[in-house]
């Protein structure tokens, strides 16, 4: 904690810190550390989501938002919409706001893979209307 200001305490009112995880291994490694840190405003970002992730052990009242997004780029790994909905349900159960911010370039929904251009990934996530 030597890198934070002397008056940090449990964090500043105007600073939100997010922790990104892309798979279960990184969630289980990073999130216990993240949750133990003196940060007033925390969010968990699953991005790029490259596999199903169970956040139920980590989402609680100390987390202000759970956010999910797929991977962009020509070589993007697929993101399954069912994984996104599972994170959403985990957030709802924990009374944590959820945000689906980006589909990624390869979104699987109902067994079909959709190739979504970068310029439409945010708008397509909004159109899902699951926030």
Named regions from a protein language model:
Residues 1-52, 63-79:
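Core AdoMet radical
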Residues 32, 50, 56-131:
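Auxiliary Fe-S-binding modules of radical SAM enzymes
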């Amino acid at each position: 904690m030597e890198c934070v200001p002397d008056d940090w305490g449990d964090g500043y009112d105007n600073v939100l810190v997010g922790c990104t995880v892309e798979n279960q291994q990184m969630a289980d490694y990073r999130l216990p550390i993240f949750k133990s840190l003196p940060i007033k405003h925390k969010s968990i970002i699953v991005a790029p989501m490259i596999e199903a992730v169970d956040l139920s052990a980590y989402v609680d009242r100390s987390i202000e938002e759970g956010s999910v997004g797929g991977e962009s780029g020509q070589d993007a790994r697929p993101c399954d919409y069912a994984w996104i909905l599972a994170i959403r349900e985990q957030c709802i159960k924990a009374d944590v706001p959820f945000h689906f911010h980006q589909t990624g370039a390869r979104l699987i929904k109902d067994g079909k893979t959709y190739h979504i251009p970068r310029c439409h990934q945010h708008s397509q996530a909004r159109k899902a209307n699951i926030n």
